[in-house]
């Protein structure tokens, strides 16, 4: 008989999640198609069948969530003329850490004449979770890009309240080798108190950043502002021949956030619209 108790478990190390997913897309025979696919560990990529339009890829973390010491890496590259919409099967969950941080690293590359939409569903942080998230984007001149990252601190409908957590979010976006957008966002360890500050979130527990880079991003400015309303903001910059549209949204919970984020994504993503998995 094997007896298990705290004494003989204390020396054991827990199995960690490690996942890597890599996808390359090419434009061939009038369609955007897979040119390379690599999957390792908990990272899986599935492509619903599409006859026309951009290639759609759904990213899956088969572990169901991340905690301290877990690692997840995504790498997406588009060759000349290709288009793709990348989303996730479900919200990513970051659970309480027993030590160390969970890490999510994403690298996106888009060649000339491509259109890339990075549209993962929300990342949910639970109490005492620790997350380091990194996004690196390389765009060639003439590439178009739409990026959405939404973060939720606890699920209000489930009675969850995040008091303590750590969250670091780092973005670097380059166009033609030049940095056109950079972010270093950090919260914690007293997240509950920090979110109450008027200069941070004013008591909101859900937030999103939307970034669009294309030649005509300015045409969406006024409509985007109308969708956002008072709880957020929208700005426009010229970056060389292209323009950059940046949107910030905040809301009391994920449901209220989605009520504005979904029509905004549908607007900015053109004919591709909102990913179907967002509505399931």
UniProtKB/Swiss-Prot annotation:
Keywords annotated in UniProt: Chaperone, Cytoplasm, Nickel insertion, Virulence
Subcellular locations according to the entry: Cytoplasm
Major localization listed first in the record, in broad terms: cytoplasm
GO cellular component: cytoplasm
InterPro entries with a match to the protein in the record: UreD
GO molecular function, one term: nickel cation binding
Family stated for the protein in its record: Belongs to the UreD family.
Subunit-structure text: UreD, UreF and UreG form a complex that acts as a GTP-hydrolysis-dependent molecular chaperone, activating the urease apoprotein by helping to assemble the nickel containing metallocenter of UreC. The UreE protein probably delivers the nickel.
Cited HAMAP family: UreD
Function: Required for maturation of urease via the functional incorporation of the urease nickel metallocenter. Disruption of the ure1 gene cluster suggests that it protects brucellae during their passage through the stomach. The major route of infection in human brucellosis is oral.
Identification of the protein by name: Urease accessory protein UreD 1
Organism annotation: Brucella abortus (strain 2308)
């Amino acid at each position: 008989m094997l007896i298990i108790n705290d004494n003989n478990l204390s020396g054991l190390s827990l199995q960690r999640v490690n996942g890597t997913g890599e996808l390359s897309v090419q434009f061939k025979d009038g369609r955007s198609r897979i040119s390379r696919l690599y999957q390792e560990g908990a990272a899986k990529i599935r492509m619903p069948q599409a006859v026309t339009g951009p290639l759609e890829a759904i990213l899956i973390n088969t572990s169901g969530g991340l905690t301290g010491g877990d690692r997840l890496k995504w790498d997406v590259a588009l060759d000349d003329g290709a288009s793709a919409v990348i989303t996730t099967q479900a919200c990513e969950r970051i659970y309480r850490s027993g030590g160390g941080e969970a890490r999510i690293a994403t690298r996106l590359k888009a060649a000339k004449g491509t259109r890339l939409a990075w549209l993962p569903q929300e990342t949910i942080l639970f109490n005492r979770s620790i997350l380091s998230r990194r996004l690196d984007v390389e765009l060639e001149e003439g590439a178009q890009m739409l990026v959405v990252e939404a973060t939720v601190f606890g699920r209000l409908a489930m009675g969850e309240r995040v008091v303590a957590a750590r969250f670091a979010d780092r973005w670097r976006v380059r166009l033609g080798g030049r940095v056109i957008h950079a972010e270093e966002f950090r919260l914690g360890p007293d997240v509950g108190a920090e979110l109450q500050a008027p200069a941070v979130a004013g008591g909101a527990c859900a937030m999103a950043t939307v970034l669009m880079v294309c030649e005509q991003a300015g045409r969406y400015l006024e409509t985007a502002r109308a969708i956002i309303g008072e709880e957020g903001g929208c700005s426009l910059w010229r970056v060389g021949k292209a323009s950059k549209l940046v949107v910030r949204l905040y809301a009391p919970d994920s449901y209220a956030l989605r009520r504005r984020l979904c029509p905004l994504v549908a607007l900015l993503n053109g004919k591709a619209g909102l990913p179907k998995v967002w509505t399931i």
